[in-house]
């Protein structure tokens, strides 16, 4: 359908406005009073913030139709993963730099009791 993405944007803006109003309705507690009074006010404020957060999540899921739980990330089988350090192994300053590599050829990661060093 043509023009439906604009409706989706409007729904998102409406949801964000509602959530903003909720957060603005709960200002931080005042720093006046005894230590116990301040602690109680902060505790109640944090409880209200948690409620607002859960309400905001429900608003977003209702307006945007998102699922409650995130979609699990699909990972390759553990047998196919190995460390590949054939390029510049041990060069100073480059450890942890670059993209992780997945090698499909070698199903053996490490033999029991052996360590491979480059």
Swiss-Prot record:
UniProt comment concerning the protein's domains: The RNA-binding motif binds to the RRE, a 240 bp stem-and-loop structure present in incompletely spliced viral pre-mRNAs. This region also contains the NLS which mediates nuclear localization via KPNB1 binding and, when the N-terminal sequence is present, nucleolar targeting. These overlapping functions prevent Rev bound to RRE from undesirable return to the nucleus. When Rev binds the RRE, the NLS becomes masked while the NES remains accessible. The leucine-rich NES mediates binding to human XPO1.
Gene3D superfamilies with a match to the protein in the record: 6.10.140.630
Other known facts: HIV-1 lineages are divided in three main groups, M (for Major), O (for Outlier), and N (for New, or Non-M, Non-O). The vast majority of strains found worldwide belong to the group M. Group O seems to be endemic to and largely confined to Cameroon and neighboring countries in West Central Africa, where these viruses represent a small minority of HIV-1 strains. The group N is represented by a limited number of isolates from Cameroonian persons. The group M is further subdivided in 9 clades or subtypes (A to D, F to H, J and K).
Record's GO cellular component terms: host cell cytoplasm; host cell nucleolus
Alphabetized UniProt keyword annotations: AIDS, Host cytoplasm, Host nucleus, Host-virus interaction, Methylation, mRNA transport, Phosphoprotein, RNA-binding, Transport
Biased composition (Polar residues): 92-112
GO BP: any one term: viral process
Ranges spanned by the short sequence motif Nuclear localization signal and RNA-binding (RRE), renumbered to the chain: 34-50
Protein's organism: Human immunodeficiency virus type 1 group M subtype D (isolate Z2/CDC-Z34)
Motif range (Nuclear export signal and binding to XPO1): 73-84
Protein name per UniProt: Protein Rev
Post-translational modification: Asymmetrically arginine dimethylated at one site by host PRMT6. Methylation impairs the RNA-binding activity and export of viral RNA from the nucleus to the cytoplasm. Phosphorylated by protein kinase CK2. Presence of, and maybe binding to the N-terminus of the regulatory beta subunit of CK2 is necessary for CK2-mediated Rev's phosphorylation.
Residue span of region Disordered: 23-49, 89-118
Family from the record: Belongs to the HIV-1 REV protein family.
Region Homomultimerization, residue ranges: 18-26
UniProt subcellular location: Host nucleus, Host nucleolus; Host cytoplasm
Record has Transport as a keyword: yes
Stored InterPro entries: REV_protein
């Amino acid at each position: 359908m043509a023009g439906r993405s604009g409706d989706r944007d409007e729904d998102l803006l409406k949801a964000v406005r509602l959530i903003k109003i909720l957060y603005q309705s709960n200002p931080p507690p005042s720093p006046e009073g005894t230590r116990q009074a301040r602690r109680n006010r902060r505790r109640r404020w944090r409880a209200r913030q948690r409620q607002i957060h859960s309400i905001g999540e429900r608003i977003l899921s209702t307006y945007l139709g998102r699922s409650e739980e995130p979609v699990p990330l699909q990972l390759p089988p553990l047998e196919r993963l190995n460390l590949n350090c054939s390029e510049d192994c041990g060069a100073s300053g480059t450890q942890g730099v670059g993209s992780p590599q997945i090698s499909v050829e070698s199903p053996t990661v490490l033999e029991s009791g052996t360590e491979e060093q480059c």
